[in-house]
C-alpha cells in the first residue's frame, strides 16, 4: 500500500503541472481548451527526440516547453484569426499534433532507457523530491506572474473582456498568453511523465483533460473553505489526491 501511495504522489506531482495549466484556461480564462491532449504527448516526443540526439535532459525539457507553447498559440490562431469556436479549435490542434507527434520520431512509441534523464542526472535525489522542486518552482513563478500587470490583465480577461478593452488593452493578447502558458506546462508534464516511465507513447495524452479537470474539482471541493490556499496550491493538492484515489482504486 505504501508503494502505491508513493507512486501515486509521484504521478500526482507530474499531473499537478498539467492541472495548473488547465486552471489557467478553464478556470481563469473560461476557455475550454482541448489541445492539451495533443501538447502533453508533444512534450514527451519532443523530449525523446532531443534526448536521443544527445541533448542534455534539462535543455530537452526546455524544448518541450517551447513546443507546447507553440501548440497553444496554434489554438489561439484557430480561435481568434479563423473564428473557430474555442472547443473546436482545441480539438483541431489536438488532431493536428497527433500527426506531428508521429513524425517527430517516426514511430508511435519510443524508449530511452539507455539515455540519461533528469532523474539520472540528479540520481542522488529521490524522484519525488526532484518533481516536488520542479512543481514548486513552477507554482512560485506562476504565482508571481499573476501578481504582475500582465497577470492581473490575464485574470481580468477571463472575468470581463470589456473592462480590459476599457483600459486600452487588447484581451486577445492575454488569451494568447494564457493558452501558451497552459500548453507549455502540459508539454512539460508530458516530458516528465515520459522520463518517469522511460518511454513516450502516442496514446499517453488520451483523456488526460478529464484527469486534470477532476483534479481541479477535487482540489476546490476538498479545500473550498481553505481561503488561505490559492488556485495553484489547490490544483497541486487536488492532483495528488486524485492520483492517490486512482492508485488505490486500481
Residue ranges and their predicted role:
Residues 3-54, 61, 78-81, 217-224:
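Single transmembrane alpha-helix segments in multi-pass membrane proteins
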Residues 8-9, 13, 38, 58-66, ...:
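Hydrophobic alpha-helical transmembrane segments
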Residues 22, 55-95, 100, 136, ...:
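Alpha-helical transmembrane segments within multi-pass membrane transporters and channels
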Residues 24, 49, 73, 77-82, ...:
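Membrane-interface helix caps of multi-pass small-molecule transporters
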Residues 25-43, 82-92, 153, 177, ...:
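Short, non-helical or kinked segments that cap or interrupt transmembrane helices
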Residues 86, 90-147, 176-177:
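Transmembrane helix-bundle core of multi-pass membrane transporters
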Residues 126-209, 214:
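Helix-loop-helix "hairpin" substructures at the membrane interface of multi-pass membrane proteins
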Residues 186, 190, 196-250:
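Transmembrane alpha-helical segments in multi-pass inner-membrane proteins
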Amino acid at each position: 500500500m505504501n508503494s502505491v501511495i508513493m507512486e501515486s504522489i509521484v504521478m500526482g506531482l507530474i499531473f499537478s503541472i498539467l492541472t495548473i495549466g488547465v486552471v489557467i484556461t478553464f478556470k481563469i480564462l473560461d476557455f475550454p481548451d482541448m489541445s492539451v491532449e495533443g501538447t502533453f504527448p508533444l512534450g514527451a516526443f519532443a523530449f525523446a527526440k532531443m534526448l536521443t540526439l544527445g541533448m542534455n535532459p534539462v535543455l530537452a525539457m526546455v524544448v518541450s516547453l517551447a513546443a507546447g507553447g507553440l501548440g497553444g498559440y496554434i489554438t489561439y490562431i484557430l480561435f481568434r484569426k479563423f473564428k473557430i469556436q474555442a472547443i473546436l479549435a482545441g480539438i483541431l490542434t489536438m488532431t493536428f499534433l497527433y500527426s506531428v507527434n508521429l513524425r517527430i520520431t517516426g514511430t508511435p512509441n519510443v524508449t530511452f532507457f539507455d539515455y540519461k534523464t533528469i532523474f539520472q542526472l540528479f540520481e542522488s535525489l529521490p524522484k519525488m523530491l526532484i518533481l516536488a522542486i520542479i512543481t514548486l518552482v513552477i507554482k512560485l513563478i506562476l504565482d508571481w506572474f499573476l501578481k504582475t500587470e500582465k497577470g492581473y490583465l490575464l485574470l481580468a480577461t477571463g472575468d470581463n473582456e470589456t473592462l480590459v478593452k476599457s483600459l486600452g488593452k487588447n484581451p486577445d493578447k492575454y488569451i494568447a498568453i494564457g493558452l501558451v502558458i497552459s500548453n507549455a506546462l502540459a508539454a512539460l508534464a508530458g516530458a516528465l511523465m515520459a522520463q518517469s516511465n522511460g518511454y513516450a507513447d502516442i496514446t499517453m495524452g488520451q483523456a488526460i483533460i478529464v484527469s486534470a479537470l477532476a483534479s481541479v474539482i477535487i482540489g476546490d471541493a476538498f479545500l473550498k473553505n481553505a481561503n488561505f490556499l490559492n488556485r495553484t496550491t489547490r490544483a497541486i493538492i487536488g492532483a495528488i489526491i486524485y492520483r492517490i484515489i486512482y492508485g488505490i482504486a486500481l
